[in-house]
Amino acid sequence: MSVKPYIGRFAPSPSGELHFGSLIAALGSYLQARALKGQWLVRIEDIDPPREVPGAADAILRQLDHYGLHWDGEVLYQSQRHEAYREALAYLREHGLSYYCTCPRSRIQQLGGIYDGHCRALRHGPENAAVRLVQTHPVMAFTDKLRGDITADPALAREDFIIHRRDGLFAYNLAVVVDDHFQGVTEIVRGADLIEPTVRQISLYQQFGWQAPDYVHLPLVVNPDGNKLSKQNHAPPLPEGDPRPVLVEALAFLNQPVDDDWRALSTETLLRQAVEKWDLSAVPAAAAANPAFSNALR
């Protein structure tokens, strides 16, 4: 049996520029793909206009290029993929795998945050309604190539989750599965904050009859308060100067070796050596870093 060529990806949302936490996800996925002689794709997940920052998508691509993380092929923009998402929704609808839900958020909050399937048998129409997936065979666990077997919260795994929002926007879980399948992604390397929705995404793969990719969830960078470094927490953008000190700090965060003479290396050579020495098994499952570097190294 032939082995599928490796295809990895980095898929940021344009809600702001990349920060050190974003770099960890980008660098980890890049090194894994290059070490396995595979492709590394970039996708801009611009399906939530209210959260997007004008110019952020272009800024992200410039940052990746500045840090030597050069992608293969054309960048895919989710904003240009609406027809594919509509086709996916139609397929699920035609096969009885989705339904319209008019329950307000307040009702679900009263239930403790987990939806109870109230609208599944009510045959609502599309007006002022979200679309939910029928969880016929919920995925209760999956294997992470870094963390081993991960068991989901049973209530979360069984929930009929939203795949098309009431406001007309496509839900993240639907779009990411449709696009990863379309792009032939064989392994997803991303941050540990996305462990929770993984079982939902695998269940969507099964509903479509597609093979799910492998998963690797990297450790998250946290700020001194213990919160995930994020755009919402006002994480500073990556420095615009010499990328090498920041790349070295990112490699150290991922527990990867770096030569003492790295300052004599070009960015290209530094990354090439990082690819040659890449060891996924050395990456810690949990780690923390103080993002103050981004001010100190400007």
UniProtKB/Swiss-Prot annotation:
Zinc as UniProt keyword: yes
A GO MF term: zinc ion binding
Cellular component, GO, one term: cytosol
Record's keyword terms, sorted: Aminoacyl-tRNA synthetase, ATP-binding, Ligase, Metal-binding, Nucleotide-binding, Zinc
Binding residue positions for L-glutamate: R9, F10, A11, P12, S13, E45, Y172, R190
Cofactor(s) needed: Zn(2+)
Chain residues that bind ATP: K231
Known EC number: 6.1.1.-
Motif 'HIGH' region per UniProt: ranges: 12-22
Biological process according to GO: glutamyl-tRNA aminoacylation; tRNA modification
Domain of life: Bacteria
Cofactor binding mode and count: Binds 1 zinc ion per subunit.
UniProt binding sites for Zn(2+): C101, C103, Y115, C119
Enzyme category, top tier: ligase
Motif 'KMSKS' region per record, residues: 228-232
InterPro entries: Glu-Q_tRNA(Asp)_Synthase, Glu/Gln-tRNA-synth, Glu/Gln-tRNA-synth_Ib_cat-dom, GluQ/Sye, Rossmann-like_a/b/a_fold
Function: Catalyzes the tRNA-independent activation of glutamate in presence of ATP and the subsequent transfer of glutamate onto a tRNA(Asp). Glutamate is transferred on the 2-amino-5-(4,5-dihydroxy-2-cyclopenten-1-yl) moiety of the queuosine in the wobble position of the QUC anticodon.
Family label: Belongs to the class-I aminoacyl-tRNA synthetase family. GluQ subfamily.
UniProt-recorded name of the protein: Glutamyl-Q tRNA(Asp) synthetase
Origin species: Cronobacter sakazakii (strain ATCC BAA-894)
Gene giving rise to this polypeptide: gluQ
